[in-house]
């Protein structure tokens, strides 16, 4: 299952389009999934679901691969300018702090992927596809 809304509408897609209150429903979904058949391959990204609380729950119930995506400050700035977003410096700093804290807490269960060039993104895309299609973590 891929979590989020991907319909080509707007600057932000995926879990950014979900309600801020989505976590309760997400955890209920995960609970039902782990009791049912074939409880694997749940893919999500973004600020709504990528929280320490959710990751702790998932690590307790599922074989898990946590991928933390990073970019250089220069690449990140160019990306924000290109899409013309209006996220405040305070918001961006808060997201960085959140990811840094998650990275520290889950250092033994996470991998860092640097996505500064399109080739980095393509490489990670290939890895994700192999992990999902070969049923390996």
PLM feature spans:
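Conserved nucleotide-sensing/catalytic segment adjacent to the nucleotide-binding pocket
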Residues: 1-48, 53
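Conserved beta-strand scaffold positions in the cores of enzyme catalytic domains, especially
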Residues: 2, 64-68, 112-114
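Residues at the C-termini of beta-strands that transition into short coil/loop
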Residues: 4-7, 70, 116-118
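Well-ordered, non-membrane alpha-helical segments in soluble/globular domains
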Residues: 19-31, 51-54, 85-101, 125-130
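Hydrophobic helix-cap positions at the C-terminus of alpha-helices
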Residues: 33, 37, 58, 105-106
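Conserved phosphate-donor/acceptor-positioning beta-strand/loop module used by diverse small-molecule
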Residues: 45-46, 60-80
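Short, surface-exposed basic-aromatic patches at helix termini and helix-loop junctions that form
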Residues: 55-65, 131-133
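NTP-dependent small-molecule kinase module
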Residues: 104-137
């Amino acid at each position: 299952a891929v979590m989020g809304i991907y319909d080509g509408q707007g600057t932000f897609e995926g879990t950014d389009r979900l309600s801020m209150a989505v976590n309760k429903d997400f955890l209920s979904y995960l609970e039902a999934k782990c009791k049912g058949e074939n409880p694997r391959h749940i893919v999500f990204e973004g600020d709504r679901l990528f929280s320490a609380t959710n990751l702790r729950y998932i690590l307790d119930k599922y074989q898990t691969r946590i991928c933390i995506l990073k970019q250089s400050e220069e690449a990140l700035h160019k990306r924000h300018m290109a899409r013309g977003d209006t996220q405040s410096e305070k918001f961006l700093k808060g997201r960085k702090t959140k990811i840094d804290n998650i990275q520290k807490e889950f250092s033994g269960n996470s991998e860092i992927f640097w996505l500064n060039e399109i080739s980095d993104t393509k490489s990670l895309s290939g890895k994700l596809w192999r992990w999902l299609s070969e049923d390996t973590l």
